[in-house]
A protein has these predicted regions:
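Extracytoplasmic beta-strand/coil segments of soluble accessory domains associated
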Residues: 88-127, 154
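Short acidic/polar hinge/loop motifs at secondary-structure boundaries
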Residues: 126-154, 204
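Transmembrane beta-barrel wall of Gram-negative outer-membrane proteins
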Residues: 201-334, 349-350, 364-380, 385, ...
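Gram-negative outer-membrane beta-barrel transporters
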Residues: 744-879
């Protein structure tokens, strides 16, 4: 599998998949036509009561048909019937939606092959926060068992909350009075993870339990709904990764016993040969526990026909703890010889020398979400409806990490000279053409599993980061029913205040050099006698490193530092902190129409939304002092004297929109839409802080290196990305189970993103130095994207029993874009003084999250008590930016996943349920800073769930 060419082989397979998709649609269309025999009236069809997957697909088809905008949906009339283990996995079954997977689960959502940056996500119609620093919703927070409808608006209308160039994802929970019946439901699932079974001392077993209750009281004027879930699972991972900073090394200058010569920007354009290397290579084994508690609640009060009051609250508290064991080749730019590279600078093989480190860390993350809102709907007359809504959403994520490093030395811990008589060990790097798995081979004379060889330069760090994201919002909407061409007039205003604050502080670096006798005592005391995992990276063809000497982190901290946890710094101030406030005021007016155009009924809406955004970003500035580490290197630390720098930005955008639906035949709709849309930068990308980075975990040896590593951690003056959009869709609904649709869309972007360098002054050890600081600006570039979206779904009811329980759905999206994102170090760069652009040496990426091909296929079978469903998802390669921006380019390779779900009704109200995720252990492969240059391969295995659900 890993020897395939990631660029060409995957592309050929994509073409084959697209062809298969077209063939399936051609096959399904006649089947649809056969399912509606002449004389079959609606009464006959309505007499059939359907449940399960078929009911969900029917509801989704009906939602799409009835909505005014172009919408795809996944909905169920009952709580807990969304067929997925998480909301993210449920969304990826919707036409045009795909996901980015982390820890084996669906996380960020891309619509029509466009990343989460271009999408907007709301919960019960309100913006939701997250702990990632961007505007995407962490769908893992929301159990699918407590959600009963998901809508994706592909086109905009004036009444929707602004923010979705690609679309808007709306997650909804039920309203208890609208549900209309009492329901008590309990479900318990056991999880088995084969990778977890390979962790020493773990069986790979976890569980999740869900309990929900819905009821109505006081003559159906008061309704309540409450759901709780406990999730206690494990998500072990194994990975190889290069660092996130890559350098172009001059191939015409060979340097030994030092770092390669960097291809400086002043020399760009001179045609020097170069190759691309990272600062470090790391093999990482992760053992993890993951716990989450979630509570959803809603109260609905309808005291009369004129009032409808809804209060809903969501709470999620998730904690996971990771034990990481790293083998780190920390000097990947040093003493490079025999370098073989291609015309793009991608290294195929090289030899190098580096200190080798056995690093260990204990990381814990706690993420708490609290959200909800109060909505009051009043109908003072049959024609007028007034709605006032207030909402609150807050996410707090806190990470604590304790890290320890032990390095190689010319001697072992017993003082015996090694065969190399050098702290740096020879190694080779090789990668076969087309593979994403490099083979790194350490000189065989060095025993990676010998604890005696890892003891020198003991370094201890205690990091804590905290992200606080809060949104307070209110809106007022009014709707008036009318007679004539316009059937309804709507207007409203919305105000919101979003705050994002974070810090990342370090209690360290503690570089300790006790007498070697003390090192020897601690080394022997704190050894892990066995590697924490069996068969490490055995699925990665070509991997040559399967284990290394590891140590107990708690023991090392206790013996070297006197405490297992020195605690976080009390003073959390840092120049890298972010403090962003964004205030939004928006208003809209929209008119719905429903008329006949000749013999064709036509309905739709036309409107305009005006959005005013004010951003205030505060950053701290301080002098820096040099602190000697005692090993010939130094680090930079801030003084206690800080001053605040405030940067403000403002923008006003006008967003017109029009949607029209033509009923060209009783079961055929033609939709057209035109609109202007906007997507705001991530909150973390608006920071005004500055960071001095040490990507390889080393320390500075001179002040010039320190200056070269200063960067902005945001660009407060970034404006929203704007686009003009046009969509046209044809939809055929032959019966309740079937749909055949095709949508063409076009987006014209006004502006892009481009690195820009500003000179800033810093005081370092009493000296004022001028430092070029790279940020991101809105470029004047124009770009576009066009695409085609296809959907086909049907149940094969024309087949003889029992095959008439078969059904299928397939969706495919093709997109083509010429948008450009430049690499912040090696790409084109704008000079604000000369107002010129200096060309880079590597090509740009496209939109973040943009995939040219997205395919989702489902096959299901339901008959009697049995329900089976298989789901296949494919996504072609895409660029994924790092949260916060101002980072180098990162690409994610094509991904394919196959999931399976099954249920068996044991008796009335009781069912046995089974689910398998990522059955074929598809890894995640990433590349930097150009596609094809391997940066990481990441395996997390399959997951299996089996459980029982009971309803009363």
């Amino acid at each position: 599998m890993n020897s395939r060419n990631p660029i060409h082989a995957r592309t050929r397979r994509t073409v084959l998949l697209a062809s298969a998709c077209s063939a399936l649609i051609a096959t399904v269309a006649p089947a649809m036509a056969q399912e509606a025999p002449a004389g079959a009236g609606p009464e006959e069809d309505d007499a059939i009561i359907v449940t399960g997957i078929r009911e969900t697909i029917q509801n989704s088809i009906n939602t799409k048909r009835e909505e005014t905008a172009i919408v795809d949906a996944l909905s169920s009339d009952d709580i807990g019937d969304i067929p997925a283990i998480s909301v993210g996995q449920a969304i990826q079954t919707i036409t045009g939606a795909t996901t980015h997977r982390e820890k084996g689960d669906a996380s960020e959502i891309a619509l029509r092959g466009l990343g989460p940056f271009l999408s907007n996500s709301t919960f019960n119609g309100r913006d939701a926060t997250n702990g990632s620093g961007d505007r995407s919703v962490n769908f893992n927070q929301f159990p699918s068992e407590l959600v009963n409808n998901i809508k994706i608006y592909k086109t905009q209308q004036a009444s929707l909350v602004e923010g979705g160039v690609a679309g808007t994802i709306e997650i909804g929970t039920l309203r208890p009075l609208d549900f209309g019946k009492r329901r008590i439901q309990a479900e318990v699932k056991a999880q088995y993870n084969p990778y977890g079974d390979r962790i020493v001392g773990s069986g790979g077993i976890g569980w999740r339990g869900t309990l929900s209750y819905v009821d109505q009281f006081a003559n159906d004027t008061i309704g309540i709904a409450i759901g709780v879930q406990r999730n206690d699972t494990n998500n072990p991972e194994e990975t190889y990764a290069a660092s996130t900073t890559w350098t172009a090394c001059r191939a015409d200058i060979v340097v030994t016993n030092n770092n390669c010569t960097e291809y400086g920007r002043d020399d760009y354009g001179e045609g020097h040969p170069f190759y691309l290397v990272p600062n470090a290579y790391t093999f990482r084994q992760i053992s993890e526990t993951d716990k989450r508690d979630a509570i959803f609640g809603a109260i609905q009060w309808r005291p009369s026909d004129q009032f409808n009051i809804n209060l809903d609250v969501q709470y999620s508290d998730r904690t996971f703890v990771e034990s990481r064991r790293d083998l780190n080749i920390s000097e990947a730019r040093r003493s490079l010889t025999n370098v073989v590279y291609d015309e793009n600078g991608i290294v195929q093989s090289l030899s190098g020398q580096s200190a080798i480190e056995s690093n260990g860390s204990e990381l814990s993350r706690a993420e708490e979400y609290l959200g909800g809102g109060l909505s009051i709907e009043w109908q003072p007359s049959d024609r007028l409806t007034l709605i006032i809504d207030g909402s609150y959403s807050r996410t707090i994520r806190v990470e604590d990490e304790r890290n320890v490093r032990l390095r190689t030395d010319p001697t072992d811990v017993n003082g015996v000279r090694t065969v190399f008589n050098n702290m740096r060990i020879p190694y080779t790097y090789e990668i076969a053409p087309g593979s994403f798995v490099p083979t790194i081979t350490i000189d065989p004379r060095f025993d990676l599993n010998n604890h005696d060889l890892f003891w020198d330069d003991a370094r201890f760090r205690r990091d804590q980061s905290r992200r606080h994201n809060k949104i307070i919002a209110g809106r007022f909407d009014a709707g008036y029913e009318m007679d004539g061409f316009f059937s309804k007039l709507s207007a409203g205003v919305r105000w919101s205040e979003m705050t994002f604050r974070d810090y990342d502080v370090r209690n360290g670096d503690f570089n300790l050099n006790p007498p070697i006798a003390e090192d020897r005592r601690i080394n022997n005391l704190c050894r892990n006698r066995a590697f924490p995992q069996t068969d490490f990276l055995s699925a990665a063809d070509g991997n040559a490193i399967t284990s290394w000497a590891t140590f107990d982190v708690d023991c090392l901290f206790r013996e070297y530092m006197g405490s297992e946890d020195p605690g976080a710094l009390e003073d959390k101030r840092s120049p890298a902190n972010r403090d962003v406030t964004e205030r939004t005021l928006a208003g809209y007016i929209m008119a719905d129409y429903d008329v006949d155009l000749g013999s064709f009924p036509v309905r739709g809406n036309i409107g305009v939304r005006v959005v005013k955004t004010d951003v205030t970003s505060n950053g701290l500035r301080s002098e820096f002092v040099l602190v000697d580490n005692g090993d010939g290197t130094f680090r930079l630390e801030t003084t206690d004297d800080f001053e605040t720098v405030t940067i403000k930005s403002r923008s006003t955008r006008i967003l017109p929109s029009v949607n029209a639906i033509f009923e060209v035949a009783p079961n055929t709709l033609l939709r057209v839409a035109g609109y202007r849309a906007m997507s705001r930068p991530a909150p973390s990308a608006l920071g005004a802080g500055r960071t001095f980075t040490l990507d390889d975990g080393g320390s500075f040896t001179n002040i010039e290196d320190a200056i070269d590593n200063v960067r902005a951690n945001g660009s407060p003056r970034l404006k929203p990305l704007m686009s003009w959009n046009a969509d046209a869709a044809i939809e055929w609904y032959p019966n309740k189970d079937s749909i055949l649709s095709a949508t063409l869309y076009y987006k014209q972007f006004n502006g892009g993103f481009q690195p820009v360098v500003f000179d800033e002054q810093f005081v370092i050890d009493g000296q004022t130095v001028t430092v070029p600081v790279t940020q991101t600006r809105n470029s004047p570039d124009k770009s576009r994207i066009y695409g085609l979206e296809l959907t086909a779904a049907t149940r094969f009811s024309f087949l003889p029993k029992p095959l008439d329980g078969l059904g299928a759905k397939v969706s495919y999206n093709y997109a083509d874009s010429n948008f450009e994102n430049e690499d912040v170090r090696l790409g084109d760069q704008f000079d604000p003084v000369t107002e010129t652009v200096s060309e880079g040496i590597i090509p740009p990426a496209s939109l973040s999250g943009y995939s040219k091909h997205v395919l989702s296929a489902q096959a299901y079978y339901e008959i009697g008590p049995v329900s089976l469903q298989a789901i296949y998802n494919y996504r072609s390669k895409y660029y994924q930016d790092f949260v916060g921006g101002n980072s180098q380019l990162r690409f994610v390779g094509p991904s394919e996943t196959v999931d399976f779900r099954a249920s068996l009704d044991l008796m009335k109200g009781v069912s046995l349920r089974f689910e398998a995720l990522n059955i074929f252990n598809e890894p995640k492969a990433t590349y930097m800073p150009i596609y094809g240059s391997s940066r990481q391969y990441h395996y997390y295995g399959s997951k299996y769930f089996i459980g029982i659900r009971a309803r009363i």
